[in-house]
Amino acid sequence: MNTSILIDSLIKNHSMHSRESNFYKEHEESLRQMLEMSDFNDGKSGKDSIMPFGNLDFPYREMGAINTIHLFGLDELIIFSYYWANKSRYKKVADLGANIGLHSMIMDRCGYSINSYEPDPMHIKIFNENVKNNNCSNISINQKAISDQTGTMDFIRVLGNTTGSHLAGAKEDPYGELETFSVETVSINEVLLNNDFVKMDIEGQEATAILSTNSDTWSNVEMILEVGTSKNAETIFNYLNQINVNMFSQKIGWSKVSSISDMPISYKEGSLFLTKADLMKW
């Protein structure tokens, strides 16, 4: 999949990343056509290129209603393009909610040293296989969930969509067939203090985690994350304004968030970027 032109365009035109823009819709269609032809599809070899990151061995798998092709959506490639644009700025990075490791492997191809966190042993097994098959040497895998404190908590596996599995209490009214088991947790503060950059997708736990941080925690780290609900968006907006951490939102072309309406309230509105700096550097 020769996505080099797409990635380059995403970097150069980052102010057009709103999902409502014509730019977004055109690039989403281009990506859809590339994915239809790719060897990442069901029944194909699972081996294809994703340029400029190189060749990838990533066999098709189903995780309930979601499959591995969904992991290559345009919003994900926007995040990949940010990794690529900033590969000379960051050294140590963390992937929180790593799933089966696609983001971690893309980070590896950017030359980062990666600490990856994923609590589901089913995902961890596949993640380890992917790391081995792709000769990734810079990824440290931690079978732990991220929260406001280090310890243990119940984890809910959503069998109909394991990408939506989460810590107990993180989501209201989880749907479908569920499995519950205990997992180790690590405090987000420990992660933020030991990395330059963090990608976080922790399925509803983001507000709880962020509320445990303070202004100093953010002095030397930046983050891109998914916000899952309007309640979490409001909580994060109010708290980060109090501790002087700036927010930049994909839904407004990565401009600085100035009101609650600028905040994403689900994955359908794109990602959020957090930093003490005055700009999101592309």
Feature roles, as predicted:
Residues 71-96, 140, 152-157, 168-218, ...:
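Short internal loop-to-helix segment that lines adenine-nucleotide cofactor pockets
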